[in-house]
Amino acid sequence: MIANLMLAAALTGVHTPETSKLFERRTDPESGVVSYSLVYGAPDDNRQSLYFVTKSMTEDGRFLVFNYTKGNERKGRGPRKLMVADLLKDEVHELGDPGMIPFVDCKKDYIVYGRLKQKPGFYRQNLDDPGREIKLCDIPGALTEMGRVRYLATHLTLTRDRSKAFLDASVIAPNGATNYVQGLLTLANGVFESWGTTDFFCNHGQLNPVRDDLALCAWEEAWLKPGQDYKKTTGWYPRMWLVEPGGKRTLVPARDRNCASHEVWDDDGRGFSWCGRPGDYVYHHDLATGRQERWCGIAGARHNNVSPDNRYVVCDEAPERWWRGCKWRVAFWNRETERGVWIYSTRPALMPREKQSRLHPDPHPHFVMNGRYVVCTANNADGHMDLYVTPVDQLVKMTTP
């Protein structure tokens, strides 16, 4: 933890969530955990963390990237925009509408994204120069020639040298068939290297953090008939796939529960974790050995993230019935002591079940700044979302005898 503090202090003059005027202190009434809520716009506007595969905060602690809407879905809202909080200047700036979940380079403080509408192409924005797009390349012709591109990537990930982006695109062919295409896009010239296509709903693609020739993808909606037919034939629920160049795809079965969702790479790329199913836990797969273990004792986990040193896990849980906008709580789990604490013990339903949210308001907790903080979304009964940043040191102390 001392090393993390030194990294955070490397950029002189940067405020922290504890000291910045952009945050207000929040204390959970049951667990006593202290978090810091981002303050921007009106109190009932939406401030939402990024999807858990993408880290919301840069390693130097200066920039926090988040989604924002003026208003909320109960009272009416404006368009969703990507924003950045600059903790050096204690200011918030608009990054526009990237058209997808961006890749955040947490070491060099910039984002990369691809957009299909309104100036299609792939772009970069430096977070210290917000709002100025730098075009990298056009949408690859190798995709547009196949048909109508529905989306370019579920959430963008880049190669280690940041020169290429992994795409898991969806393309509607002229005959109406949907093809799911995986491969690498060279950002300097728009050349696309296809790794192959699937007829099953293949998405959630994530390039391995330390290997440019390996991606983790999901068979989305594997509970529907095609996935169930595959399970009847092979015995395995076909959620998690390792994808490599040349069309090589390897199913990684969830051997303990034969069900999986929301998989994510470890930061060191040596393995990945996932959630079992409602009422289940967080599991982990080691690439080298194939060993699978339960890494978190929180039942009902739906999204999880592992700390850079693999000692801690955060996850969110819907304590009652799940829907888009249901009640949530978020947990921290100490793998060394096998103890947990609630970052927030329960948040009320954001939206009623008969009128669900369209903003994907799940908490999506994830570690940032080399494990110093956890970032997640917290819902409120009046229909607005808050963004919480929670110091990890207190969570370790609370779960250590």
Residues covered by each model-derived region:
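Blade/loop signatures of beta-propeller domains
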Residues: G13-Y36, G176-N179
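Blade-terminus and WD-like Trp-Asp/Gly-His loop motifs, strongest in beta-propeller folds
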Residues: V53-L64, Y68, P102-K117, H155-K164, ...
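Conserved blade-ending motifs and adjacent loop-strand segments that build the rim/top face
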Residues: D256-C259, W295-N305, E338-H366
